[in-house]
């Protein structure tokens, strides 16, 4: 199973937001390169790098992310990537995959030529998928979205429980149990995931998971 360490960036710093709210921010490090190197040394080989400034439309962290992409490990980049040019820019800079939400709902056809490099992020609250920084309602239930994008040929998804994100309450078992087995091998679970839940998620048949706050409390809790 693929376990990703989340590295969320805001103003060039490594942070975590609770439930995606900018006012609920914890800064863990002012040096993202130190963080990715430390996590790699601790045994994490996959990284989920999120540009929160770009996601919120208040700036971007492209320069530091491009430096992080030169480090060891498998890296996927997310956050505010809403046009094909930016996708290509990240891939050209060394990203193994690019994670999208808004563009997948607004213009999915534009992504088909690059679908092997695309992971679609499905952010869920009250059974409905949201996009554009969790501000817009897609009108689709989770399994409807998984079916729609799978039929188009997309092979990897991140399913995030918005209410669990950054809470350390554990992954959302209701959501996890609701996803048909045929899709689980394509899905990375996210939102509240704890280090001690990795084996359980693997036993449920999921492709992987993304761990954020629990990771930082363990390795960077004295920040």
Regions inferred by a protein language model and the residue ranges of each:
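Alpha-helix-loop-beta-strand connector modules within alpha/beta enzyme cores
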Residues: 5, 57-79, 110-124, 170-195
